[in-house]
């Protein structure tokens, strides 16, 4: 026997028993962004490697360690997309969607990072993101946060997530702070771990995000970014906080929150949970006003967020919010004998036409009554419809209840759709 081929490590199948929860989550996401007037954009999974080097930053974990990069047959360097924002900006620039325009966009699809697989973190993962272009004011920052809060409300997890906020200031403010932070770190270089020493000059703000306990203890005495902000940055952040308070969204200001991508400025945020252990961030984003220009477009203000769907699915399962999902099949249609098979198929088709949301499965492959009932039960259907010679002669259908202790019923064929509609 040939050796069985397995899925690649960190890239998982979503099986039929798991897909209803995914479908429920995806429906909530689509319906919510639709209610805010956002439009979907779909971009290729494979992009030029240079796109991510220029957007994410060459001295980041993603570009240095995690990207799936390869040369195609023309010798061009290509990369499986590790995130969605850069591709969205590239598409916006390429198709003239961004200059002097406002765009509210969303995307959903697979992303790829060569990380160590662990609970809630995979090498292929599915990301949902929101991107807004052309609006520089704090009210749109508040809107994307309100939208994210609405997602938690619809998923029933509002009580299990908290919002952390920070502002990174503009380019000049960060440059002044960067110099002060480097000077401080140079004085305490012996305390820094290897990762922080490497980042000290190339990307010093990422040192603030270090998980090393000694580094975090040192940073308690480090310069504070907010001390370097001018009036515009302070006013923008203050207005955002006022708007969130006005709509009842609670938040915590976290001055160490810097995000892992180079393109962020001003507002940054994360929604975090304590229900998933170390993988606590479930949604993250912020403002990236320089990215469109950085990728060849005209300077355009932008703000957005992204969330990993695997982590949301894991959270829903952890909180046992994955139980209230309807069956994969509502009605299973059986036929007793070859003479009844055609009518059984027609009845199934009539039900699908009359009840578009009903999930109707026809038995295929033959078999006696016992075998068909076994298949019906295994399908998860709440009822099985039995079409035999007697039922056919009387223009009736026998309804066998599979999940309730009820006697079998005979229903007139012309009343069947109404009966099933009330049942499911």
From Swiss-Prot:
Pfam families: HGTP_anticodon, tRNA-synt_His. InterPro entries: aa-tRNA-synth_II, aa-tRNA-synth_II/BPL/LPL, Anticodon-bd, Anticodon-bd_dom_sf, His-tRNA-ligase, HisRS-like_core, HisRS/HisZ, HisRS_anticodon. Keywords: Aminoacyl-tRNA synthetase, ATP-binding, Cytoplasm, Ligase, Nucleotide-binding, Protein biosynthesis. Its EC number is 6.1.1.21. Its main location: cytoplasm. Disulfide bonds: none annotated. GO terms for cellular component: cytoplasm. One of its GO terms (molecular function) is histidine-tRNA ligase activity. One of its GO terms (biological process) is histidyl-tRNA aminoacylation. It catalyses: tRNA(His) + L-histidine + ATP = L-histidyl-tRNA(His) + AMP + diphosphate + H(+). It comes from the Bacteria. Homodimer. NCBIfam families: hisS. This is Histidine--tRNA ligase. It comes from Shewanella pealeana (strain ATCC 700345 / ANG-SQ1). The gene is hisS.
């Amino acid at each position: 026997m040939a050796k069985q081929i397995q899925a690649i490590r960190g890239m998982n199948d979503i099986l039929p028993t798991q897909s209803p929860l995914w479908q429920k989550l995806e429906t909530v996401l689509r319906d919510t962004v639709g209610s805010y007037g956002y439009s979907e954009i779909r971009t290729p999974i494979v992009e030029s490697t240079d796109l991510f080097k220029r957007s994410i930053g060459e001295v980041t974990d993603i570009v240095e360690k995690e990207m799936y990069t390869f040369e195609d047959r023309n010798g061009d360097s290509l990369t499986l997309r590790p995130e969605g924002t850069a591709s969205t900006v590239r598409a916006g620039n390429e198709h003239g969607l961004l200059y002097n325009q406002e765009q509210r966009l969303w995307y959903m699809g697979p992303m790829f990072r060569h990380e160590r697989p662990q609970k809630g973190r995979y090498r292929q993962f599915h990301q949902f993101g929101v991107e807004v272009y052309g609006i520089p004011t704090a009210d749109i920052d508040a809107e994307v946060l309100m939208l994210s809060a609405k997602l938690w409300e619809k998923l029933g997890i509002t009580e299990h997530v908290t919002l952390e906020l920070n502002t990174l200031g503009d380019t000049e403010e960060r440059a002044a702070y960067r110099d002060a932070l480097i000077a401080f770190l140079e004085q305490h270089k012996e305390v820094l771990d290897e990762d922080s020493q490497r980042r000290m000059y190339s990307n010093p703000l990422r040192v603030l995000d270090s998980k090393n306990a000694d580094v975090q203890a040192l940073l308690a005495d480090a310069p504070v970014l907010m001390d370097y902000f001018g009036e515009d940055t302070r006013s923008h952040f203050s207005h955002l906080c006022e708007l969130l308070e006005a709509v009842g969204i609670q938040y915590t200001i976290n001055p160490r929150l810097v995000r892992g991508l180079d393109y962020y400025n001003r507002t940054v945020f994360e929604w975090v949970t304590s229900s998933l252990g170390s993988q606590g961030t479930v949604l993250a984003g912020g403002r990236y006003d320089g990215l469109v220009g950085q990728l060849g477009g005209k300077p355009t203000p932008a703000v957005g967020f992204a969330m990993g769907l695997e982590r949301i699915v894991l959270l829903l399962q952890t909180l046992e919010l994955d139980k209230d999902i309807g069956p994969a099949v509502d009605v299973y249609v059986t036929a007793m004998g070859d003479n009844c098979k055609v009518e059984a198929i027609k009845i199934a088709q009539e039900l699908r036409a009359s009840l578009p949301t009903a999930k109707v499965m026809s038995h295929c492959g033959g078999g006696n009554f016992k075998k068909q009932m076994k298949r019906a039960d295994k399908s998860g259907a709440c009822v099985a419809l039995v079409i035999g010679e007697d039922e056919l002669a009387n223009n009736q259908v026998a309804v066998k209840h599979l999940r309730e202790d009820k006697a079998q019923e005979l229903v007139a064929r012309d009343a069947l759709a109404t009966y099933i509609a009330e049942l499911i």
